[in-house]
Amino acid sequence: MKNILIFGGSGFLGSWITKSLLKKNLKITIFDLRIKTELLKNLIGDEFNNIDFIEGDITDFEGVLKATKDMDYILNLAGLMTPDCSSNPSLGAEVNVKGSINVFEAIKRNNIKFLIYTSSGGVYGNEDKYNPFPETHYGAFKLAVEGIARAYFNESLISSVGLRPFVIYGPGREVGGTAGVTLACKAAKQNFEYTVGFSGKVGFVYVEDVTNLVERLIDKAPLGAITMNINGITTSVENFISIIKKNIPDAKVKFSGKPLSVVEEILGGDPSKIFNDFKYTSLDYGINKTINFY
């Protein structure tokens, strides 16, 4: 049985990835600053007892180095989200940039040759659909990590894939600047009022599309320092809410606020460049699954 270490693995995305990877007969270890178990237990049930946990700080290099020893695969999902990076940019850089360097350096010293990490659609600004031009601290830190990944490939032949998802939604996505559409699904099902705090068009990605890509990338482990745009289905927040109301007509959900500081859609570098049969989950299906979870 091969070993996989997931930094930041007890959060929303990490919990879903763990659920997905359990069927691959991998020994999973989760490294996180604060271990969160509620969603993970909900998703995987009794298999929770087969997961190992390390409570540690990604900014502590010795702890990261020790955790990566004897691992076959590494995923780095750890990082502060957009609001935290904006309110404390120094801490955001410490965690998102220095923490990522620690992971790259640790896998280099432990002779591991492939890493999957989360970048973000936030590396784009609000005009250019092809070229990254971040307009938030979070996006700037993520773009810096992509450059660091290229340096580690050029200098040490460590291959990596940086996943650039747009707005991920799905059961359990309740933290972060774009969690509002998932919280709207929860509000609709539980019959309370909720206002999504942004407007405009953006790409919506159902969480299991990301977990599917992680599964396949572990098997393929492409060579190079690759970035993968995961745009999802581009639509307006207004339309997203209309689909919620198609499921629950009396839902008390609405939206307000400015559009996000990113383009409506990112083009090029999508998953089909590596997996030509890849297709995104429809909004109708993804929203229905999210509502029914609650």
State each model region's role.
Residues 55-94:
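NAD(P)H-binding glycine-rich loop region in Rossmannoid oxidoreductase-like domains
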Residues 143, 169-182, 192, 207-208, ...:
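Glycine/proline-rich active-site loop of Rossmann-fold NAD(P)-dependent oxidoreductases
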Residues 76, 98-137:
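Conserved Rossmann-fold NAD(P)-dependent oxidoreductase catalytic core, especially the SDR/UDP-sugar
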Residues 4-24:
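N-terminal Rossmann NAD(P)H-binding glycine-rich loop of SDR-like oxidoreductase domains
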